[in-house]
Regions:
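Ubiquitin-like/PB1-type beta-grasp interaction modules and other compact soluble beta-rich domains
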Residues: 1-71
């Protein structure tokens, strides 16, 4: 059995562990966050939602995910 290395990512202020080669898209899906009406910030820079499949996370990254909800 292969042991995967883990990395620490702070997601919305909460420290979490993930496999070391995780991409932003996979993390968002793992957390069951819908991709429509969402803004993602990685280390204080907004990620273009069209490019999240290509963005790999690194140890000690800080990710902020904001999901917009309609209403009045």
């Amino acid at each position: 059995m292969k042991i995967r290395n883990k990395i620490k990512i702070k997601v919305n202020g909460k420290k979490m562990l993930f496999d070391e080669n995780i991409m932003v898209i996979n993390l968002v899906k793992k957390l069951k966050i819908p991709l429509n009406k969402v803004a993602i910030e990685l280390n204080k820079k907004i990620i273009d939602i069209k490019k999240i499949k290509k963005v790999k996370l690194n140890n000690n990254d800080i990710l902020e995910i904001v999901h917009f909800i309609g209403g009045g």
